[in-house]
C-alpha cells in the first residue's frame, strides 16, 4: 500500500538563504615579517597581577621634581668646589712647607678617594642589575625569533655569569642537544629546559629554607621585636644568596629595589604580633588557641618571605618565565604547613615521653 500524501505546509514569509561569510584574502609574509612575527598570548591571572603591580609601582614611584634637580646640581657644585679647594690647600701647604696641613690634605684626599671608589662600586652593581633586565628582554626577543647564530654565545655568557663550569653536566647536555642549524629560539629554549632549572632549583631550596625558618621562629618566639629583627636579617640574607646564585652582586642602591618588600614583611610581623596579643587578651583563649594563632602568624610570615624570594628570582633571573616554570606560592604554603604540623607534633609528643 502506498503511504498517504502529507498536507501542504505554507510559510508566512519567503525562505532566507544561509549567509556564507566571504573568504578573506590570503596574506603572504616576507622574510622580515616572518622573523618578527609572534603569536598572540592569552593573558593569565598571574600576568594581570604583575601588570597591576607594575601600575601601582609606577604610581608610587617618586617623580623627579624641579627642587630635586636643583638640590642635585647644588651638591655637584659643592663637590667640585671642595675638590678645587683641597687642591689649592695642598699646593699652598707644599709651597710653604706646612707638613701638618699637607698631611691633613693627603688624609682628606684618601678619604674622598675611598668614597668615590665606593660610589663607583655601587654604581657598577646597580648597572649590573639593570643590565640583567636588558638581558632578560633580549632573551625574550630571541624566544620569538627565527634567526640563527646569536643564542649560543648569549647562553654561554649567562652560564659564565652564573659560575657554571664548562664541564657541568647540565651544560654538557645542552651542548650535546644543540647544533648549528637550530634557530635562536630553539637554542634558548633548550638552555631554559636543561641548564636554567639547575639554578632555579637551588633558588627554590633557599626560599623554602628561609620561609620555613621564618615560620618556625615566629611560631615559637614570644617577642615581637625579636621576630622583626629575625625576619629582616633572614630576608636580606635571602636576597643576597639568590642574587649570588644568578651571578649578581647586590650593592646598597641595587638592594633598595627589593628592600621595600623586606619592609612589608617586617611590618606584617609587627602588626600581626600586635593583633594576636590584643585579640587573645580580649578573647581570653587558652594556651592551645594561642599556639594556633602563633602557628597561623608564622605561616603568614613564611609566605611573605617566600613571595619576597620569588620576586628576587624574577629580578635576578636572566631568562623570562616559560610555561609553568614560575614557582607558585601555593607550593611553598603546602610545604610550610607540613613542616609546621610535623614540628608541633614532635613538640607535643616529647613532653609525654
From Swiss-Prot:
Its transmembrane ranges are 70-90, 99-119, 213-233
What the entry lists under Pfam families is as follows: DUF697
What GO cellular component term, any one, is given? plasma membrane
Q: Would the keyword Transmembrane be found if you checked this record's keyword annotation? A: yes
- PANTHER family for this protein: UPF0283 MEMBRANE PROTEIN YCJF
What is the similarity comment for this entry? Belongs to the UPF0283 family.
Q: What is this protein called?
A: UPF0283 membrane protein KPK_3110
Look up and give the organism this protein is from. Klebsiella pneumoniae (strain 342)
Amino acid at each position: 500500500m502506498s503511504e498517504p500524501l502529507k498536507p501542504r505546509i505554507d510559510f508566512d514569509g519567503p525562505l532566507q538563504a544561509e549567509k556564507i561569510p566571504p573568504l578573506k584574502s590570503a596574506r603572504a609574509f616576507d622574510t622580515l615579517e616572518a622573523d618578527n612575527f609572534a603569536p598572540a598570548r592569552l593573558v593569565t591571572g598571574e600576568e594581570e597581577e604583575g601588570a597591576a603591580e607594575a601600575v601601582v609601582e609606577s604610581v608610587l614611584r617618586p617623580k623627579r621634581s624641579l627642587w630635586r634637580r636643583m638640590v642635585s646640581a647644588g651638591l655637584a657644585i659643592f663637590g667640585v668646589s671642595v675638590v678645587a679647594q683641597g687642591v689649592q690647600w695642598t699646593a699652598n701647604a707644599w709651597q710653604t712647607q706646612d707638613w701638618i696641613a699637607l698631611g691633613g690634605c693627603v688624609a682628606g684626599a684618601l678619604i674622598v678617594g675611598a668614597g668615590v671608589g665606593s660610589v663607583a662600586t655601587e654604581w657598577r652593581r646597580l648597572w649590573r642589575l639593570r643590565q640583567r633586565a636588558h638581558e632578560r628582554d633580549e632573551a625574550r626577543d630571541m624566544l620569538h625569533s627565527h634567526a640563527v647564530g646569536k643564542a649560543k654565545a648569549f647562553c654561554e655568557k649567562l652560564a659564565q655569569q652564573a659560575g657554571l663550569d664548562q664541564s657541568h653536566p647540565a651544560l654538557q647536555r645542552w651542548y650535546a642537544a644543540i647544533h648549528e642549524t637550530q634557530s635562536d629560539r630553539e637554542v634558548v629554549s633548550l638552555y631554559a629546559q636543561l641548564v636554567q632549572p639547575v639554578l632555579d632549583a637551588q633558588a627554590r631550596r633557599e626560599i623554602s629554607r628561609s620561609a620555613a625558618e621564618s615560620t618556625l621562629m615566629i611560631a615559637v618566639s614570644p617577642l615581637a621585636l625579636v621576630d622583626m629583627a629575625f625576619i629582616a636579617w633572614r630576608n636580606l640574607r635571602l636576597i643576597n644568596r639568590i642574587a649570588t646564585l644568578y651571578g649578581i652582586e647586590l650593592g646598597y642602591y641595587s638592594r633598595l629595589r627589593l628592600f621595600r618588600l623586606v619592609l612589608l614583611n617586617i611590618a606584617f610581623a609587627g602588626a600581626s604580633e600586635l593583633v594576636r596579643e590584643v585579640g587573645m587578651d580580649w578573647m581570653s583563649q587558652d594556651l592551645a588557641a594561642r599556639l594556633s594563632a602563633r602557628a597561623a602568624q608564622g605561616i603568614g610570615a613564611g609566605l611573605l618571605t617566600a613571595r619576597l624570594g620569588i620576586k628576587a628570582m624574577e629580578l635576578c633571573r636572566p631568562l623570562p618565565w616559560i610555561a609553568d616554570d614560575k614557582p607558585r606560592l601555593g607550593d611553598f604554603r603546602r610545604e610550610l604547613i607540613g613542616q609546621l604540623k610535623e614540628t608541633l607534633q614532635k613538640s607535643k609528643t616529647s613532653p609525654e615521653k
